[in-house]
Amino acid sequence: MESLTLQPIARVDGTINLPGSKSVSNRALLLAALAHGKTVLTNLLDSDDVRHMLNALAALGVSYTLSADRTRCEIIGNGGPLHAEGALELFLGNAGTAMRPLAAALCLGSNDIVLTGEPRMKERPIGHLVDALRLGGAKITYLEQENYPPLRLQGGFTGGNVEVDGSVSSQFLTALLMTAPLAPEDTVIRIKGDLVSKPYIDITLNLMKTFGVEIENQHYQQFVVKGGQSYQSPGTYLVEGDASSASYFLAAAAIKGGTVKVTGIGRNSMQGDIRFADVLEKMGATICWGDDYISCTRGELNAIDMDMNHIPDAAMTIATAALFAKGTTTLRNIYNWRVKETDRLFAMATELRKVGAEVEEGHDYIRITPPEKLNFAEIATYNDHRMAMCFSLVALSDTAVTILDPKCTAKTFPDYFEQLARISQPG
C-alpha cells in the first residue's frame, strides 16, 4: 500500500485558497441539471464525489462542458425531472452526496434505474430515505440487503404526506427537499427524531432559493413544499470554499502558527462547518473573520467538552487537535460519525491510541487525553479522506507520522498534502 511520511513541522504560516465545497458542488450540479436554462458553476470542486455526480448526470443525458481544470462547469438544464432511455445502472462510488439526492430525484416520473457503488456504500444506510419516498408513491426495490444500496428505482413519487427520520443523516431530508418541488402534488415532510447536522439543511434551502424555489420551514420539524414548481438557473453561481477542508489548516495554525488564512469562506458563509473556528477560539486560538476569509493564530490550547452535532465533519479535526490541548477533551453527540465513509468513531479511537493518547470510545462520544509525547505511528485511513487529513496534524509535534493510502483525500481534496507542505516549515 502507498504511504506518505510527514516529517515534524516546526511552524505553519500562509494563505490557502480553498477548493470548492463538496456539499455545495454536488447540490448545485443536481439543481442546475433539473433547472430551466444554462448554469455556469465556478470554483466547482474537482474530486471523486463530484466526478461520480457528473458521470451520473451525463448517463442521464444532461449536457455539460468542463474547463481543463474541471472547476468551471456549464450545464444545460433539463427543465424538469431527469429521465433515462430504457434501463440504466449508475455507479456512484462511495459518494453519499450523489447517492442520496439522486435516489430521490430519479423517483420522479417513470424510470427504471439501478443505483450502486463501492462495498462501503452498500454498508451506508438509506432505509429512512426509501421509507419516506415510498410514502410519497415511489416504487423502490432493495437489490441486496434491506435498507442499504444497491437500489432499483421505478419512479412513482407524487408528493403527499411523508415523514423521514432525521437522526442518522441530514442527507435524507436534503434529498426529499430538492425533489419535492418537482412532484405533481404538494409535499409535507415531517421529521421524526432529532434532526442531525441542521446546518447542512440550511445549505440545501439556500441553494434551492438561489435556483428560484422557496419552501416553508416550520422550525425544522416540518417542511411544506408546493408541487408543480420548476427550478430556474441563476446564470452564474460561485461555489463557496469547503469549510470542512478549512478546518485542517486553521487547526494547524492553532497548534503551530504563525497565522494561516483560508480564503473562499467567511463570516457570511452558508456552511455550518465555519463554526469550527469558534471551537478553536474556545480552546485558546485567535480567530479573525472577514467576508471572504477566516484566519487563525496560535494560542495555548486547552481541552473542551462540547456537543458537536452541528459540525460532525469538522469535529473530527478537533479530535486530533486535542492531542495538543491541555487536559481531557470530550466530543459529544457524534453518533453519525459511525455511518460516514467508515465508522469514524472506531477509526478515530483506534488511531489516536497508536500515537499514545488515552481514548474512551462511547456509543456517541469520544474522550481524548493526550500523552506527554506523541509516538511515531503508521496511520490506517480506512479509505476515508478525513482520517488522512486529520492525522496529518500529528506532524505538528516533534514526531513524524506515516499516513497509509494518502491518495484517499481525492474524495474532497486531491492536493491536500501539497497545500499543507506549502505553508509548513520543517522542524
Swiss-Prot record:
Protein family (similarity comment): Belongs to the EPSP synthase family.
Name of the molecule in the record: 3-phosphoshikimate 1-carboxyvinyltransferase
Listed Gene3D superfamilies: Enolpyruvate transferase domain (3.65.10.10)
EC number(s) per entry: 2.5.1.19
HAMAP family given in the database record: EPSP_synth
Active site per the UniProt annotation: 313
Assembly information from the UniProt record: Monomer.
Catalytic activity of the protein: 3-phosphoshikimate + phosphoenolpyruvate = 5-O-(1-carboxyvinyl)-3-phosphoshikimate + phosphate
InterPro entries reported for this sequence: Enolpyruvate_Tfrase_dom, Enolpyruvate_Tfrase_sf, EPSP_synthase, EPSP_synthase_CS, RNA3'P_cycl/enolpyr_Trfase_a/b
Binding, phosphoenolpyruvate: 22, 96, 124, 171, 344, 386, 411
Keywords from the UniProt entry: Amino-acid biosynthesis, Aromatic amino acid biosynthesis, Cytoplasm, Transferase
Chain positions recorded as 3-phosphoshikimate binding sites: 22-23, 27, 169-171, 197, 313, 336, 340
Coarse class of the protein's main subcellular location: cytoplasm
Class of the enzyme per the UniProt entry, highest EC level: transferase
